[in-house]
Amino acid sequence: MRRIALIGVVVFVAACKQPAPPGLLQEYQSRSLMTCCNIHYETDQVNDANYFVGSTIPAGTPVKVDAMTGNSVTFTTAEGKKLTVVHSYGRDQESMQQWVSKLLVADDPKAKLATFSKSAQQAVREGRVEKGMTREQVIMSLGYPPTHRTASTTSNEWTYWYNRWVTYKVQFDDQGLVANVIGSPAPTQNQPIQPDPKPVPTPKSASHGKKRK
């Protein structure tokens, strides 16, 4: 058993040291990219579980790709924060390129964020998940769930990691809205998403419609 575990560690380390596919680094360095979603970090290296701990790089943060390996990408934000994100858990379900293409995107998520209701916008900015959120809003807030436990985002149940020991689940209803958040702790305040209030009609002027003499 120890030998099998050791082999697994050796394979993982070897994958980290392998270069990215030819041309992939140059492709990402030539593009204007930003983070798809909120990314949490405690150190300068995190993984695709995106634990809900530490500081946050907000969704839509512009980044410059510095380096890539067979299962990691290193980037720097405009503010100078350098972070390496390792594709640790989902590498058997999706390729390095598929994963990076989800993590770093060309279309600014902030433009889409601005179309959400005010309560949904606040939840995303605070990295929360609340009942009534759409799949898109949950991804922007929490990131993509690791694919080794959530094979597809069309599933009605997603598994996330609060930290390296604790998981929680996000369940969706048939309309694609969050119905339940199961597990504790979890990044929720139990405040269901509310639609924005309808604007109050402007009263018509008393002189409106009168003919001029």
How would you describe each model-predicted region?
Residues 17-213:
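Residues within mature, well-folded domains
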Residues 2-8:
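Sec-dependent signal peptide recognition
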Residues 12-15:
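C-terminal motif of bacterial Sec signal peptides marking the signal peptidase cleavage site
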